[in-house]
Design a protein with these regions (language model features):
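C-terminal accessory segments enriched in acidic
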Residues: 41-45, 197-360
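Short glycine- and acidic-rich boundary segments immediately preceding or forming the N-terminal edge
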Residues: 31-80
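Extracytoplasmic/secreted envelope proteins and their assembly/folding machinery
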Residues: 49, 53-56, 60, 116-120, ...
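Surface-exposed patches in mature extracellular/periplasmic domains of secreted proteins
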Residues: 66-73, 129-136, 283-288
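Conserved phosphate/anionic-ligand binding catalytic regions in large, soluble enzymes, centered on
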Residues: 106
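Active-site/substrate-binding loop(s) of hydrolase catalytic cores
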Residues: 95-102, 110-260, 314
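Proline/glycine-enriched tight loop/beta-turn segments at coil->beta junctions
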Residues: 79, 90-98
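Secretory targeting signatures
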Residues: 1-34
Length: 360
């Protein structure tokens, strides 16, 4: 049984790579006009929260049959957390595989926002393009969810954390002691482990509320992570990517230990395909951030996998935190759109692949 399961998943790698190659050729040619029209001598202009909000509303008005836009919550400073859904029946929760893409948990990491927005435009503008039938096929068979800016306050302030006031590491002090929580350390898995293994997980570094990795007084203490939690609990999806920058590598659970998940083989299969498309290094088992950096406690990936069973990845895009070259940014967007299309197609078989993997 295990041999048969392994063969099925290895076949998924080969098939996935073929899909990726087929998608990439028309995709790159379809947007070549966009890239050539950019003035490469001028720095790339990243979308602010207000610019993103305006563009999302404009796209929703123009493509209302394929795109819905809703706020899943408010930040401490009152900004909406926008969620985009793409589907051929966008107002209906269908029994179709879902995928989720998120960006900007860290407010000073902006390329992921551009990747998500570019993908939204690409899907909408090419939905009726007869030379790109895979776009219509994906819209017909997949429910695509995007939260392109998880941390609007942090993006606006250009800071890693959000902007909520802290009252000491446990939230007990009467006065404000610092500002901001690292949202990708605020999920409830395995948030409390640092207290059991303080040296392994560098508790003295992550406990002070002024630390750039401060994880909040308790799990899901922040408006932003609460919103993601409530949204994901109400929707089904098989695969997710959370974008960060930078490093050009791919990470998957477990994020805090070298111990493998029950779906290690499937995580590797999908991850290897992502790597084939974008050329990034897939961190597996002992390549992980353990024990060199103590691992990542409270990440969205761990929580999404444990709570939803989703194959949840972090993709660290690019080799600089905020590239200024328009060509570099467009290349990131182009490549990751190909990744997105592959994942939407692979999502069609993920549950059956899981069943095959766990046959006894």
């Amino acid at each position: 049984m295990k041999t048969a399961s392994f063969a099925r998943i290895r076949l998924g790698i080969t098939a996935g790579f073929c899909i990726a190659v087929m998608l990439f050729v028309p995709f790159t040619s379809a947007i070549s006009d966009q890239t050539s029209s950019q003035t490469v001598t001028e720095p790339y202009q990243y979308h602010t929260y207000d610019a993103l909000t305006d563009e999302l509303h404009s796209l929703q008005e123009n493509y209302s049959s394929l795109m819905s836009l809703s706020s899943i919550g408010k930040t401490y400073e009152g900004r909406d957390l926008w969620m985009v859904k793409l589907s051929d029946n966008v107002e209906t929760e269908e029994e179709e595989p879902g995928v989720l893409f998120m960006a900007a948990h860290h407010g000073n990491e902006w390329p992921g926002v551009e990747i998500c927005l570019f993908f939204i435009r690409y899907m909408l503008e090419n939905a009726q393009n007869s030379s790109l039938p895979e776009v219509q096929n994906v819209l017909n068979t997949t429910q695509i969810y995007l939260i392109p800016m998880v941390n609007p306050d942090g993006v606006t302030a250009d800071t890693r954390k959000n902007c909520a006031p802290n009252h000491g590491p446990f939230g007990k002090k009467p006065t404000i002691t610092s500002y901001g929580v690292n949202l990708n350390r605020n999920y409830d898995d395995p948030w409390f482990l640092a207290y059991l293994f303080p040296l392994r997980y560098y508790l003295p570094m992550i406990l002070p509320d002024a630390s750039f990795n401060y994880r909040g007084p308790y799990p899901f203490s922040e408006n932003e992570t609460q919103a993601v939690k409530h949204f994901t609990e109400a929707h089904n999806f098989s695969i997710s990517i959370s974008y960060h920058s930078y490093g050009e590598f791919i990470i998957y659970p477990w994020m805090h230990t070298t111990k493998q998940t029950p779906d290690e083989m499937l995580f590797r299969s999908v991850g290897e395909n992502i790597s084939l498309i974008n050329g990034y290094y897939l961190l597996v088992k002992n390549d992980r951030l353990i024990p060199l950096y103590g691992g990542t406690l409270g990440s969205s990936e761990n929580w999404l996998y444990r709570e939803k069973g989703a194959l949840a990845y972090t993709v660290e895009v690019g080799n600089e935190r905020r590239p200024t070259s328009p060509q570099v940014v467009f290349n990131l967007c182009m490549t990751q759109t190909t990744v997105h299309l592959y994942l939407c197609q692979r999502a069609q078989t993920i549950e059956s692949e899981k069943a095959a993997l766990h046959q006894t």
